[in-house]
Amino acid sequence: MARILITSAIPYINGIKHLGNLVGSQLPADLYARYMRGRGHEVMFICATDEHGTPAELAAAKAGKPVEDYCAEMHEVQKEIAAGFRLSFDHFGRSSSARNHRLTQHFAGALAENGFIEEVVERQFFSVADNRFLPDRYIEGTCPNCGYDKARGDQCENCTKQLDPTDLIDPRSAISGSTELELRETKHLYLRQRALKDEIEAWIDSKTDWPVLTTSIAKKWLHDGEGLQDRGITRDLKWGVPVRKGSEPWPGMEGKVFYVWFDAPIEYIAGTAEWADANGKTDADWERWWRTDRGAEDVRYVQFMGKDNVPFHTLSFPATIMGSREPWKLVDYIKSFNYLNYDGGQFSTSQGRGVFMDQALSILPADYWRWWLLSHAPENSDSEFTWENFQSSVNKDLADVLGNLVSRVTKFCRSKFGETVPAGGSPGEREHQLVAELQQRLAAYEACMEAMEVRKAASELRALWVAGNEYLQSAAPWTVVKTDPEQAQAMIRLALNLIRLYAVISRPFIPDAAASMMTSLGCEDWSWPADVGRALEVLPAGHGFTTPEVLFRKITDEERAEWQTRFSGVRS
């Protein structure tokens, strides 16, 4: 049994996330966590809300609420929606937790002690209208790289280029919109990433199995232009982790907080500590996942994120870990994703464009969305959500293939043999061929899941469903029963066991449907099918079942057209 630590990029607190956020981090992370648990491994799956920085302050101000209250409310909203999508976090934490405050301050102190923090006097925009310094995300303007007119002072969300506020063309305050900005002096802490460049580069070079998307972005940031730069890790904000050197005050840094991108990844560790606190466990219980001197040396750590988060996870967070000179666990594998677009444009939380997670669940249950998003995950390139494709995929894959098999088998058995697994007959050559095909396809499915090739895994799972349907079409028990009822019973006995097999292996993708299939079969045996032949004998003759309701209903053309109009791309 392996020990797998899984973290998903933590979503910003500023509103409900869209489907692009979901498929770029949390959902594939959940798929992998569910699969690894299903294979019997020990899994720790951590996520949280990212509650500090400009987005939280601006969103709270817009909502007319104190930022602490806003974050507490939105954490519960995001937690509830995550549960609605059946995201199986072991803990869904908060970056504003006391644990994260202490750990962030601890890392800053360790970095300073080791000479990797520099105090820098810099010139920063001061808004005369707002009477305050403006951190980078409080400044908007036109991106000098791509011309996008809503670029932020830290990064352009359109082209992902990292920016300095002074790079922006026609900068303005994100608070008031005022262009009356002055450059004034202020002092901040910088993480000396350049001093750690050789260590970081050697570490990245050692990760020969990483996706091309991950390594290409990391190496681009390492080498393009002037290469890896030192990074400011403090801001002139009120809301955040107060700047301290470990447990001690930091002279000259009074009233400042740590930059959100410094404290947010540390929440992966803090969130695991929060899990221990919430479950009455000790520090040793979470440290065995994170400290290589306390049991984490055999842990495999996998991160999931969108491509815009890759630089922070391949450069800045590793620099924090390495520079601490403490035995913390570094990530082993980073699975990154491209963007999911919406009807010819980009999803965007800040711009309110696209279908959002709460809206999606108000239309259809989670499994419909999970299946489409995972089977169309933007792994090798950007992908696009269209209502036509969504309807086609749901109707063909879920309703016509899997749902149809479950319905035909259970209803036929009920009508001919009652709601018990029939006892007659024995497997023939056709059944043996099916078992061999399923064994081969299952191995391919497992290989894709192990490699985190999400779209290929979905394709292999669908092929497993198709194999069962093709067997039924070929065997035709509804015809055989007229001349050889014993053989028809053997076919249906195998087919009922096939439903259980599909429930077990489909659970990572469609957990609710899997649970429904198992409930109908009156079975609680979720053991992974190492041997398909034996797996197709788990339900014995005489075992009772109930004929389920429709597993997946089809989406009508009228519904598709109505949703297309209703969700035209802008959230009110």
From Swiss-Prot:
Matches recorded under CDD domains: Anticodon_Ia_Met (cd07957), MetRS_core (cd00814)
Main location: cytoplasm
Keyword annotations from UniProtKB, A to Z: Aminoacyl-tRNA synthetase, ATP-binding, Cytoplasm, Ligase, Metal-binding, Nucleotide-binding, Protein biosynthesis, Zinc
GO terms, molecular function: ATP binding; metal ion binding; methionine-tRNA ligase activity
Subcellular location: Cytoplasm
EC number: 6.1.1.10
Top-level division of the source organism's lineage: Bacteria
Reactions that this protein is recorded to catalyse: tRNA(Met) + L-methionine + ATP = L-methionyl-tRNA(Met) + AMP + diphosphate
GO biological process: methionyl-tRNA aminoacylation
UniProt cofactor(s): Zn(2+)
Amino-acid positions noted as binding Zn(2+) in the UniProt annotation, renumbered to this chain: 143, 146, 156, 159
InterPro entries associated with the record: Anticodon_Met (IPR041872), Met-tRNA_ligase_1 (IPR023458), Met-tRNA_synth (IPR014758), Methionyl/Leucyl_tRNA_Synth (IPR015413), MetRS_core (IPR033911), MetRS_Zn (IPR029038), Rossmann-like_a/b/a_fold (IPR014729), tRNAsynth_Ia_anticodon-bd (IPR009080)
Motif, 'KMSKS' region: chain positions: 346-350
Protein task: Is required not only for elongation of protein synthesis but also for the initiation of all mRNA translation through initiator tRNA(fMet) aminoacylation.
PANTHER family reported in the protein's UniProt record: METHIONINE--TRNA LIGASE, METHIONINE--TRNA LIGASE, CYTOPLASMIC
Record's subunit section: Monomer.
UniProt similarity note: Belongs to the class-I aminoacyl-tRNA synthetase family. MetG type 1 subfamily.
Protein's recorded name: Methionine--tRNA ligase
